[in-house]
Amino acid sequence: MFRIVLCDDSPADLMVLCGHLEQLKEKRPVDIISYTDGLDLLKDYKQKGFCDILVLDMRMETMGGIEVAKHIRQLDDEVPILIVTATVDYAVEGYKVGAFRYIVKPVESSDFLSAVEELLDRQQKKQASIFSFPSISGTTKLMTDHIYYLESDLRTIRVVAKEGTFTFTGTITTRRCFP
């Protein structure tokens, strides 16, 4: 299941984007999570740890998409980010935070879905070889061939890998483990 997170402070625009993504459910297993506030998104991202694609509105009242992206990059420097906005004036800023693409509103379904599907294809290839889990510093990602073994004691998971030993709270079945 791919997790796509959207953040736009306009409920109407959020509904349009979610509607476009609903079309993907016929082809791919996607979970769509939406936020109307960047601060709420950051709070949940710190707790839950990851998503496969992040779609951010550039201009939001509480915290703009670029600010949200900067904070996300401190937690996860690999998550693909799509920026959507009504103006192209800040396109360069979007690319400074490593945005994959910049899409101008009103968002055309075909353009948006094309970008999302390209990212999902990339993520699917990555998933075959990466194990990710939440950590204090954000999301930790390890190559599966670097993992020696996993241990579970109630809800505490211990990962012993080439890079070191890591622990997180959860269950192995809820994580994307091995292909």
Give the role of each language-model region.
Residues 114-179:
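Conserved binding/recognition cores within well-folded domains
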Residues 7-8, 35, 54:
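Conserved sequence signature across two-component system core domains
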